[in-house]
Regions:
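Secretory targeting signatures
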Residues: 1-60, 414, 419, 431-432
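Extracellular/periplasmic solute-recognition and catalytic clefts
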Residues: 314-326, 354-419, 442
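Append "and occasionally in soluble cytosolic enzymes with long acidic Gly/Pro-rich linkers
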Residues: 314-315, 321-327, 333-337, 423-538, ...
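Aromatic- and charge-enriched surface segment that lines or borders ligand/interaction sites
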Residues: 129-220, 258, 365, 421-423
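A bilobed periplasmic-binding-protein/Venus flytrap-type ligand-binding module shared by bacterial periplasmic
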Residues: 115-116, 326-330, 403-430, 434, ...
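N-terminal lobe/hinge region of extracytoplasmic solute-binding protein
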Residues: 76-135, 306
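Gly/Pro-rich hinge or "lid" segments in bacterial periplasmic/extracellular proteins
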Residues: 116-118, 222-245, 254-255, 260-352, ...
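Detector for C-terminal structural segments
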Residues: 25, 103, 265, 322, ...
Length: 675
């Protein structure tokens, strides 16, 4: 997906609720290029269905059935190519925070609960045999599945679960910090202690050791380094630490694990269902570098480690150019009963995942049946993809092309609310009403008359009904007269002038002209981005605004941690790590907690957001979301770009492909059949 995750740890004053993957995710978003729109473009899109576009070649009817070249091997050329993320960044689930990582994390490691098929709102127990929710969504108790082993033979128990959750935070990496802030740790304590620890853990250390761990933070770090790098549940002191009741993570018994949150939180199971909830083997970790405060495990990052999942890592290519998976010979799901579908044993033994392949290689691999899963960079390549397909006389385009649905995240151009001239609300409203959003949709996200995206009004996307636009606000209208009205007000307030193409001078007619505007985009520029920016450039020129474009890199993005350092306009996207539209979409967009480039910072909104994520009454939440929508709509901090659909190319014999908009797809459910 295009979803971008800032890889920055929690700072002394900010919570980075990185919403990405997702992060957001095991397949590339349809960041799609299009054909030209019809001569008359409707004011609103005429379709939001996911019907596949249909080139119409001549199909020869026959009994021919394409077979995989090797029924024991699946080749995935998608590689989940994000801008700037062509390969995994790490194979340790406590470090990795990039879309390409999911091929390993989804299939080698497992969580207590995992997504139920394609549903983003439902989970099923996996490493937990069952769970209970207590104390008004503030306490979660898990019974750990017995007779489970890691692929190296080490048995799983509740102590391993405790170790994994503590380690996820203690390494100090963005993936843990972003997904547990304000839930199991208080980010305000990080600067004081120089550690990211679950709440109550330092008190547990002090209770078990008699040492001043709550005041001597260097000593506390030394104790934790020693304990986690020489993890031994048979040690009475370590056991006392884990069993201490007044902390975030508590071991209640060899197969019972409890989580106590800082706040009631209805979506916690959805949070831990992805790889930052993965359970790792303490013995392996300790034998390969151990655990140290704010320090990644270089060996684990480079090579991966044993998990409890259906696959294990067989080999890792140079610079993560490819990863090969093979069946976990000790997989617990082979002989277990009532195994959830997401955890079923694998059907195809060998999985080859290729990363960063050039488009021509992907086209050739799929055309010749070498690859079973692939991706075209944009719809402009759809015809090329199908024209090269050696079996097109037997299979229509729709038989190998699948639209999987909308991206749960949002695409945007931020307008820096703290920096001239976008700090003026009338200026931002002028921009909003000067843009033809429908033109953008039809120009950039359609193919052969089929829309491959939809218009939205953020910050929530339609995937999250009923939190999406609960007040039914209209989309910003394309209205040049209204745009000119707002621009005229802004010019008078900010003392600038703008001359329209017809000679009309807006703003303060005696003031200097407003200088050129620059929209920053993530380099390299995709064809979709280019088309969308050119439409916006043309639209704004009708107001007399001069607009240019400038690429930026991920390293530049990570430096934009203040409003003053951030450009006025930034073209990006943001996606949720888990299915909480409030904490994962609204909070990043309308507060400064995640460094989104609009830097929206309104006391009325901040006051609502202080409690909104932790309310347990959905009706009350929706009413407050409606208030935030109304405020944000009139404040206009973002240009909401169309939401692109997710798509994939599959060979016709590939079955059991189950896509989840947040966790992607898993190889163990896939099988080959022509039925």
């Amino acid at each position: 997906m295009r979803t971008l995750k800032m890889k920055t740890a929690v700072s002394t004053t900010k919570i980075i609720l990185v919403v990405a993957i997702i992060l957001i995710i095991a397949i590339s978003v349809g960041v799609l290029l299009s054909r030209k729109p019809p001569s008359t473009i409707p004011s609103t899109p005429t379709s939001t269905t996911y019907t596949s576009p249909t080139p119409t070649p001549s199909i020869t009817t026959s009994n021919f059935q394409l077979e995989p070249p090797n029924k024991s091997v699946l080749v995935d050329d998608v590689g989940i190519p994000f801008p700037g993320d062509l390969a995994p960044d790490a194979l340790d689930p406590a470090t990795g925070f990039s879309g390409p990582d999911t091929a390993v994390f989804n299939n080698v490691f497992q969580e207590l609960v995992e997504p139920n098929g394609s549903s983003i709102y439902q989970v099923v127990p996996v490493l937990a045999s069952n769970y209970t929710i207590e104390n008004n969504y503030q306490t979660y108790v898990f019974s750990i599945r017995q007779n489970v082993k890691f692929s190296n033979g080490d048995p799983l128990n509740a102590y391993d679960v405790w170790f994994s959750f503590v380690r996820e935070l203690y390494l100090g990496q963005a993936v843990g910090s972003s997904n547990y802030a304000e839930l199991t740790f208080n980010p305000e304590n990080v600067s004081a202690t120089d550690m990211t620890t679950p709440w109550g853990l330092l008190h547990a250390l002090q209770y078990a050791t008699g040492l001043p761990a709550t005041t001597n933070y260097k000593l506390a770090s030394q104790i934790l380094n020693q304990m986690l790098s020489h993890f031994n549940p048979d040690n009475a002191t370590q056991l006392a630490v884990m069993e201490y009741p007044r902390q975030a993570y508590v071991v209640l018994g060899p197969y019972t694990f409890e989580v106590n949150l800082l706040h009631p939180y209805r979506f916690f199971l959805l949070d831990i269902a992805l790889w930052w909830g993965a359970i790792v083997d303490p013995t392996f970790v300790d034998e390969h570098g151990g655990v140290y405060n704010n320090t990644v495990n270089a060996y684990f990052d480079a090579n991966g480690g044993p998990g409890t999942g259906p696959y294990e890592i067989r080999s890792v290519g140079v610079s993560f150019s490819s990863i090969v998976l093979q069946p976990n010979p000790l997989y617990w799901g082979i002989n277990a009963t009532n195994v959830p579908a997401v955890a079923q044993p694998p059907h195809i033994p060998i999985i080859v995942v290729n990363y960063g392949l050039p488009q021509n290689t992907r086209i050739e691999d799929f055309a010749t049946n070498k690859a079973q899963i692939s991706l075209a960079d944009s719809p402009s390549l759809f015809n090329e993809f199908y024209d090269a397909y050696q079996y097109k006389q037997y299979y229509s385009f729709n038989q190998i092309f699948k639209i999987l649905g909308p991206n749960p995240g949002f695409y945007y151009i931020s307008m820096n609310t703290q920096k001239y001239p976008t700090n003026n609300v009338n200026f931002r409203l002028a921009i909003e009403h000067a843009i033809n959003y429908t033109q953008i949709l039809y120009d950039s996200l359609s193919f052969n008359g089929t829309l491959l995206g939809q218009l939205i009004l953020g910050p929530v996307t339609p995937s999250f009904t009923p939190f999406y636009n609960p007040g039914n606000l209209p989309l910003y209208s394309f209205n040049l007269n209204l745009a000119a009205y707002y621009l005229n007000l802004a010019g008078k307030q900010e003392d600038f002038s703008v001359t329209m193409p017809n000679g009309t001078v807006l703003g303060n007619t005696s003031a200097p002209p407003l200088g050129p505007l620059t929209i920053y985009y993530l380099a390299p520029e995709s064809q979709v981005t280019r088309i969308q920016l050119e439409v916006i450039q043309n639209d704004l020129s009708q107001l007399g605004l001069s607009v240019g474009f400038q690429g930026f890199t991920l390293s530049m993005l990570n430096q934009w941690t203040t409003p003053q350092a951030t450009p006025n306009f930034v073209d990006l996207e943001w996606g949720p790590d888990w299915a909480d539209p409030i904490l994962q979409l609204i909070a990043p967009a309308v507060t400064t907690t995640s460094y989104l480039q609009a830097w929206m910072n309104l006391s009325s909104v901040n006051q609502i957001m202080a409690t909104l994520p932790f309310l347990t009454n959905q009706t009350q939440q929706i009413q407050l979301v409606k208030q935030i929508y109304n405020i944000t709509y009139n404040y206009a901090p973002y240009i909401w770009l169309p939401n692109a659909y997710v798509y994939v190319f599959l060979q016709p014999y590939v079955k059991g492909f189950v896509y989840n908009a947040l966790s992607g797809y898993r190889y163990n459910t896939i099988y080959y059949s022509n039925q």
